[in-house]
Amino acid sequence: MNPNQKIIAIGSASLGILILNVILHVVSIIVTVLVLNNNGTGLNCNRTIIREYNETVRVERITQWYNTSTIEYIERPSNEYYMNNTEPLCEAQGFAPFSKDNGIRIGSRGHVFVIREPFVSCSPSECRTFFLTQGSLLNDKHSNGTMKDRSPYRTLMSVKIGQSPNVYQARFEAVAWSATACHDGKKWMTVGVTGPDNQAVAVVNYGGVPVDIINSWAGDILRTQESSCTCIKGDCYWVMTDGPANRQAKYRIFKAKDGRIIGQTDISFNGGHIEECSCYPNEGKVECICRDNWTGTNRPILVISSDLSYTVGYLCAGIPTDTPRGEDSQFTGSCTSPLGNKGYGVKGFGFRQGTDVWAGRTISRTSRSGFEIIKIRNGWTQNSKDQIRRQVIIDNLNWSGYSGSFTLPVELTKKGCLVPCFWVEMIRGKPEETTIWTSSSSIVMCGVDHKIASWSWHDGAILPFDIDKM
């Protein structure tokens, strides 16, 4: 075979192989398309991934097809029903730990907000910790002077319960130096108070959007609960104060639907003082235990009906639960009048259990240190001193602070009753410690049908921080 014949033979063979390759590729494509059309959902190469972002952003649907991705944004379905919340409170024999954020310990080296007034509130699908930031981080120069209650830098933010109040997981809620928040079953409602002391404004947000406002009506530091508001059958209730902290002020109950105020009523309470109420739903009504910052070491009680009628008085128990306070043995108790003649006070809480009451208080009578919850037989209706249960949450060697109530809805627990829960703030820094800042962490407890041993779930951060030594 001469050279020309060899070239022709090799070329013919190559052309034949090429044609065969093309035919095989065409057949392969046809078969693949036919199979995918007939049974596309059964192959691993075609899959759908659903990711959900926070509460109100979107659902992202990604369909992956070999090396091609198609991204489609669809509306996130909203919750269809309002929560009922007319069930009774569950009977609690003790309180078990639910969460602890350790924010200050983590904040010594993490990006954690300087906060105060943390509180917890729950939706049908989750519980969140809300807190008022100071627009600054722990162990940073902007934390200097954060003992101040009211500033233009304060904002209400939230994280999923148990998370520290860090910059990476926190969600902005409102501009506020006083606040409340609750979920009606469909969306979150927040009330954030901000502005100058004599003309403060409360902005009502629903689903993250401003819907209504409340202007100061007494011109003296309009303020609200610093704990969860209460929603029953789609109507949400909260209490506000406007006026002096050390004498008679003005108090109002507000009612909103979908974030729009549909009712309000003034509370007549001459001689009494109401601030920072801790409220919860119970048998279709809103029950609140509040703070008397004027004279009483017993706590005001407020029970609100759906038509905004109310009863107001004081926790009857013959054991005082505010701080500062006198000796238990010297306190008689009253259902109608403030007793104790001790000014100032601290936000606190309690739960009615029939005619009994669970009531939280600091262990110290004079300072915000230690924390215990006690059960007083007939303490809701009588001047009883019969303490039938006591559980220590924080020992008296460690700082506590505000405390407040919330409930776990039946949608979360699948019970036929509302689980009573509470949180305790643990304040660190100024004025008790040598730092340039004031902040706090929290421990959260929920009622169970067993006795729980006392212990100390204290903050545990080692102070001062590096910034305090400069």
Curated annotation (Swiss-Prot):
Ranges facing Intravirion side: 1-14
Coiled-coil ranges (or none): none
One family name in Pfam for this protein: Neur
Membrane topology designation: Single-pass type II membrane protein
E.C. number: 3.2.1.18
Stretches the record annotates as Head of neuraminidase: 89-470
InterPro entries: Glyco_hydro_34, Sialidase_sf
Needed co-factor(s): Ca(2+)
Protein name per Swiss-Prot or TrEMBL: Neuraminidase
